[in-house]
Amino acid sequence: MQALFIKISGRVHGVGFRYFTYKLANKMKIKGYVRNAEDGSVEIHAEAPEEILVEFLKAVSIGPPMATVISVKYERVAGQNFTSFDIVP
């Protein structure tokens, strides 16, 4: 199991980005969370096997149709053994 912290910038608030990420993560059996950050970005903590995280990262780098992704930054982090994937306020 691997873990990534992903920060996505651009037009990502108010366009369904968190819900898109939530649905995708649950479909791919990824654990963690997604939240809107105060700086206008979206932050994601994702835990899954490496090959699944690679595909997830590709998908969230595009985002939902109304989003405009400008920047995607990610780093490997320690897993926190989440049991679900949640939208965090």
UniProtKB/Swiss-Prot annotation:
Question: Acylphosphatase-like domain: from which residue to which, for each copy?
Answer: 3-89
Pfam families (UniProt xref): Acylphosphatase
Reactions catalysed, semicolon-separated, are:
an acyl phosphate + H2O = a carboxylate + phosphate + H(+)
The GO molecular function terms of this record are: acylphosphatase activity
Gene3D superfamilies listed in its UniProt record:
3.30.70.100
Q: Which InterPro entries would you find in this protein's record?
A: Acylphosphatase (IPR020456), Acylphosphatase-like_dom (IPR001792), Acylphosphatase-like_dom_sf (IPR036046)
Keyword annotations for this protein, in alphabetical order, are: Hydrolase
Catalytic residues of the enzyme: 18, 36
* Superkingdom, taxonomy of origin: Bacteria
Q: What does the sequence similarity comment in the record state about its family?
A: Belongs to the acylphosphatase family.
Q: What is this protein called?
A: Acylphosphatase
Primary gene name: acyP
